[in-house]
């Protein structure tokens, strides 16, 4: 099995090719050995795949359906990002990244879902997609694999997804973020058409984006027989996912949070969700690493300042491979933004020195960020002992 991070020139791959040995991709192996014959519930989209998949897994598990799962994060309460399950149902995070060096289709075309959530669609993965239209074509390929009696659950507020379905759809379609379909209002009241199904007000996951993620999960669960009221009720006990507004610790009155956000839209939504929890008077210190291939290329740099504007202080780490100027991109934020390119520990010390009791430090990266959350907590502890 050859992962999509392995390319020509890799010594082991070259040996496999030289010997004429059989090989396959991870998604193809998964399709043939795990997903075949099962009711696959796939969650696709630029944002929210991991959280929505985890919510759906939680709902189905609470309903006693014992699904399998493969998710790009660890849902709290499962202790693992994958499990075989004990039923025909399988929840999978459906990623649009390419499959392997020999198969440049998106991974999700291998999964053959019976129920598919198309959560949202924006330009991303600038290292492999020339433009948004190229990604839309891959989503169209996913839709083409869904049977006539399958269900596509689509975000009605996405023009890109409108274009995807306009290319052709042969399956049942339900919309969310639609007054005629599934909707959730600012008070987190869920409706199907005009009929109230329940309230997400007690769901721990913060932010309107998570209310919309939950809405899609409820719709998908309904497709396999879970009553919406039961699904909504079960989300009251949804504990979240590792690295999605995950509290890593508190020290000297400062809370340190880790999040996977790396696309400007996700950064903005994450800060908005956190702001909703801490209030307007509390300070948010945003610590961001532009680490994804798209961010390293600078494709989204002009959107970065706007996505961070609701933070009170911004620290941007310029790591290896970032060949554009983050300081220039953050100029619209004025003096509240700083760019750093030294050792991670020195950045952690700088953040800890700036933090005051009552502040929340939000660290965002799609990588480990050098363990910065733990480092900040350690420096906060040292600073507290020195006082």
Where are these predicted regions, by residue range?
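Structural motif
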Residues: 1, 42, 91-93, 117, ...
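Phosphate-binding loop of NTP-binding sites
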Residues: 4-154, 160-171, 215
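Beta-strand->loop->alpha-helix junctions that form or flank phosphate-binding loops
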Residues: 24-31, 69-73, 168-187, 202-208, ...
């Amino acid at each position: 099995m050859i992962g999509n991070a392995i390319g020509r020139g890799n010594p082991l791959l070259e040996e496999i090719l030289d010997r004429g040995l059989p090989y396959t991709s991870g998604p193809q192996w998964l399709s043939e050995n795990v997903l075949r014959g099962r009711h696959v519930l796939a969650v696709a989209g630029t944002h929210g795949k991991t959280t929505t998949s985890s919510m759906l897994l939680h709902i189905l598990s609470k309903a006693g359906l014992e699904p399998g799962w493969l998710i790009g994060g660890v849902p709290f309460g499962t202790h693992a990002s994958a499990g075989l399950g004990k039923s025909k149902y399988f929840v999978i995070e459906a990623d649009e990244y390419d499959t392997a060096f020999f198969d440049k289709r998106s991974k999700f075309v291998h999964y053959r879902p019976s129920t598919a959530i198309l959560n949202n669609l924006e330009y991303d993965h600038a290292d492999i997609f020339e433009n948004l239209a190229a990604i839309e074509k891959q989503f169209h390929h996913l839709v083409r694999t869904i049977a006539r009696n399958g269900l596509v659950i689509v975000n009605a507020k996405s023009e890109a997804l409108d274009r995807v379905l306009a290319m052709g759809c042969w399956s049942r379609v339900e919309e969310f973020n639609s007054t005629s379909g599934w909707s959730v209002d600012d008070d987190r009241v869920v409706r199907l058409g005009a009929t109230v199904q329940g309230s997400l007000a007690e769901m721990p996951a913060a932010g309107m984006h998570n209310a919309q993620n939950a809405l899609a999960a409820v719709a998908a669960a309904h497709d396999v027989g879970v009553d919406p009221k039961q699904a909504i009720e079960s989300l009251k006990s949804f504990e979240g996912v590792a690295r999605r507004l995950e509290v890593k610790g508190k020290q000297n009155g400062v809370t340190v949070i880790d999040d996977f956000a790396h696309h400007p839209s996700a950064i903005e939504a994450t800060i908005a969700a956190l702001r909703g929890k801490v209030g307007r008077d509390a300070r948010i210190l945003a610590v961001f690493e532009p680490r994804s291939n798209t961010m390293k290329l600078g494709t989204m740099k002009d959107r970065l300042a706007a996505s961070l504007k609701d933070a009170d202080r911004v620290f941007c780490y310029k790591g290896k491979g970032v060949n554009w100027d983050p300081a220039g991109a953050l100029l619209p934020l004025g003096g509240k933004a700083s760019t750093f390119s030294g050792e991670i520990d020195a950045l952690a010390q700088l953040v800890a020195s700036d933090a005051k009791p009552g502040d929340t430090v939000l660290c965002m990266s799609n990588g480990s960020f050098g363990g910065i959350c733990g480092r900040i907590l350690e420096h906060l502890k040292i600073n507290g002992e020195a006082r």
